[in-house]
Amino acid sequence: MNSLCRSKQAPFEYTLSLIGGKWKMRILYELGCEKTMRYGELKRAMPFITHKMLSAQLKELQTDGLIHRSEVSHTPLKVEYSLSDRGRSLYPLIDEMCKWGMAQGGPHM
């Protein structure tokens, strides 16, 4: 491993610890597109994620400071999720991933 790679390994591992896994980037992508979403809207946007996994991923993203969770009413409880400033700072990375996928022949919508 060359010294440039070695010097970037820790920041790379840290970033992966925040956004790694099957669903976190997709959640960040959806929130970046829609600005604010309720739990049910996120679930409909990602029909193959289980409720347990979506709840766990949202909690992790909130704990890591990448999303905000806001209670908009108490009876019945209504919660909205949005990107934090820290989460929005990842959006250029997400956009570049989309561009890369299109350039590699991925599906266009």
From Swiss-Prot:
Which superkingdom?
Answer: Bacteria
Q: InterPro entries per the record? A: HTH_HxlR (IPR002577), WH-like_DNA-bd_sf (IPR036388), WH_DNA-bd_sf (IPR036390)
Q: Which UniProt keywords apply?
A: DNA-binding, Transcription, Transcription regulation
- In the record, what terms sit under GO molecular function? DNA binding
Q: Which PROSITE patterns match?
A: HTH_HXLR
Q: Where is the HTH hxlR-type domain?
A: 10-109
What's a Pfam family in this record? HxlR
UniProt keyword Transcription regulation, yes or no: yes
Protein name per its UniProtKB record: Uncharacterized HTH-type transcriptional regulator YdzF
Species assigned in the record: Bacillus subtilis (strain 168)
